[in-house]
Design a protein with these regions (language model features):
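Bacterial N-terminal signal peptides
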Residues: 1-9
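Gly/Gly-Pro-rich "capping" loops immediately C-terminal to redox-active cysteine motifs
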Residues: 18-22, 26, 38-62
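Axial heme c-ligation environment in periplasmic c-type cytochrome domains
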Residues: 40-48, 62-94
């Protein structure tokens, strides 16, 4: 089961060009970080998490290059990255 989740998380098929940050998150991130950013296979990204204390450049670098067992998501363009990070920040601020 965990192997399948990791496999699916690593499938960088890329969201549609005009996808919202939430859509990008649900397609590429929620499989490991859960729909509410609470963590699972991957670490918690929600309010009060280590990720919430990092700056946007760190998140962009981590998403683009991967980290540890997290795959890289090189197919995201700068606008998709901005929307994804803005969505994560919005949820972290709730």
């Amino acid at each position: 089961m965990v192997a399948m989740a990791l496999l699916l998380c690593g499938c960088d098929l890329g969201p549609d060009e005009g996808a919202t940050g939430e859509e990008i998150y649900l397609q590429l991130c929620a499989g490991c970080h859960d729909e509410d950013l609470g963590g699972g296979v991957g670490p918690d990204l929600g309010p009060g998490s280590n990720a919430a204390r990092e700056d946007d450049e760190y998140l962009e670098f981590t998403i683009t290059n991967g980290r540890g067992s997290m795959p890289s998501f090189t197919s995201l363009d700068e606008f998709q990255l901005e929307r994804l990070i803005a969505y994560v920040r919005e949820v972290q601020g709730e």
